[in-house]
């Protein structure tokens, strides 16, 4: 590890990473849209639920494994599609993927990854998903879908909440310039900003549900819709055949003043009606909140920013440490609540807590 004292929680990982990263890179990762209210709310909202611990239950053997899209994972914490891992460590996504594989979980590879889909697939024997946008360029979309299938990727994540660029004031002050992802064709457009229709491979501001339906029809891989925050949109995802949804407000990076993702999770689960898996990201900094999310109906959760803190502090082993800290805290919470397996965690494990 790069620091003399090893972080013992994810908050300390962030503190250590802040000291190591250039200011503009730290701000890019940590920052959010406008006043960053949703960034903070995502984390704090979990305090609205409290545990109902049960005693005298056999917790001598704890099982943190579960299934996501039919595949077994050893930890109900997946790594979200976040672009540009090399901003935190020279090995970038290669280090992240090796860490995810060694911990038995999934890496969802961002459209803006610094590493090609092919090079990543060779780096470890783990589980990879590919994330993309509703691009204007259907030929490029089909190419990505075909490359994902050919290289053994297990699912497609389609990000739906990025049709218009956000205002991130930290980036404006720092005059931050993003680098192009490794998987775009030479001269292809970055999908960060809307442009006139037909202008290239950007994220399409004119995209509709027909675009998600087209992607679903264009691949045999499971399709997961990311960026859904209402029951109505969960129902529409089901109508076009999505296999899962990720309840996400993009970590508070696109639209400020939304509810926290955990605050809309129950609505999403109810709307899914058991037809799709419901996943969640946003504000995961403790193992205890992973258990709360599962109790509210999530199949599993994703982390985003913490993977960068792990990379910055210790590369591959830093990400392993981040995941293992969450594993340790999940185990403690499960044992203390009398829930020996992920499947034993249900709504009776928590209660809505009155405000302090």
Predicted feature residues:
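An N-cap/entry alpha-helix motif that binds or orients negatively charged groups
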Residues: 1-73, 168, 175-207, 343-345, ...
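C-terminal helical cap(s) of enzyme catalytic domains, especially alpha/beta-barrels
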Residues: 42, 257-268, 311-331
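Glycine-rich active-site/cofactor-binding loop and its immediate structural neighborhood
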Residues: 73-112, 117
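Short, basic, glycine/proline-bearing loop/turn elements
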Residues: 78-84, 127-133, 196-198
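Alpha/beta enzyme core
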Residues: 97-98, 119-123, 136-280, 287-309
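A gly/proline- and charged-residue-enriched helix-loop-helix capping module
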Residues: 101-123, 127-141
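A short, small-residue-rich loop immediately preceding and capping a beta-strand
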Residues: 104-109, 275-282
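Internal helix-turn-beta structural module
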Residues: 299, 315-343, 350
